[in-house]
Amino acid sequence: MNIKKLILPAAAALGGVVIPVLIYMFFNYGKPELIKGWAIPIATDTAFVLGILSFFSRHISLELRAFIIGFSLIDDAFALIILALFYAKTINTLALLISSIIIFILFILNYRQVKQLFYYIIVGLLLCISMVKSGIHDTLCRAIIALFIPVNIKGEFNTSFKKLENLIRPFVNYFILPLFVFMNSGILLEYFAFKGICSNSILALIYGIIFGLSVGKQLGIMLFSYPFVKFKLCNLPSDTSWLKFYSIAILRGIGFTLSLFIGSNV
């Protein structure tokens, strides 16, 4: 693994977590009932970012696409780990220990290059059960399983799967995702009565989330990425200017459904 290529997405993801949290806390400082929602603006909705980028696929190099996916994985991992560590109601130590053992088994399967999906499905189901019993949200479990499933499975199944993926991708990007947003936003319109929306608490919450995502994400990504590139600890993706990199940073502020998901678990 090329460590230099890992540094940039890791630094960008860290900045995309730290600065939004600080901005949210700035607006909600001194409000105990709202400050606990500090994790809401840290998450990026990767599916929507990739959907938007599909319109500009000709202008995105393979290296930049790899950076975006790498950033997304690390960013989502931060969000899920924070959710698991800070928002779990109760922790069952024994179940957590069993989960750790099962994760190690997944690692062994991947390390030994076991390509039969059947084993990953069985072990993954056991991991989901143990993780739910431990008190940690099962979303983290699915992310862990996906991390260990090999991507280089060869044969007829893989070829058919790729064809199906290419067939349904436009339908998912341009129809399913917008419909999903509309149907799952969880926003009650009566909350937008004039008196309610103008209360100090609601405004602080709204400002914290909106500025955390729209300003904090891009600011954090740029502030944490620039020094590493400047001191040659890593490089920008090929055929990528700082302006293009900044445009990607702006898109990382799309945190709709994942932010709602975290908010519902706060």
From Swiss-Prot:
Belongs to the NhaA Na(+)/H(+) (TC 2.A.33) antiporter family. Keywords: Cell inner membrane, Cell membrane, Membrane, Transmembrane, Transmembrane helix. One of its GO terms (molecular function) is sodium:proton antiporter activity. The chain crosses the membrane at residues 7-27, 37-57, 66-86, 91-111, 117-137, 174-194, 202-222, 242-262. It is a multi-pass membrane protein. The keyword DNA-binding does not apply. It comes from Rickettsia rickettsii (strain Sheila Smith). PANTHER family: NA(+)_H(+) ANTIPORTER NHAA (PTHR30341:SF0), SODIUM ION/PROTON ANTIPORTER NHAA-RELATED (PTHR30341). This is Putative Na(+)/H(+) antiporter NhaA homolog. The keyword Ligase does not apply. It comes from the Bacteria. GO terms for biological process: regulation of pH. It is found in: Cell inner membrane.
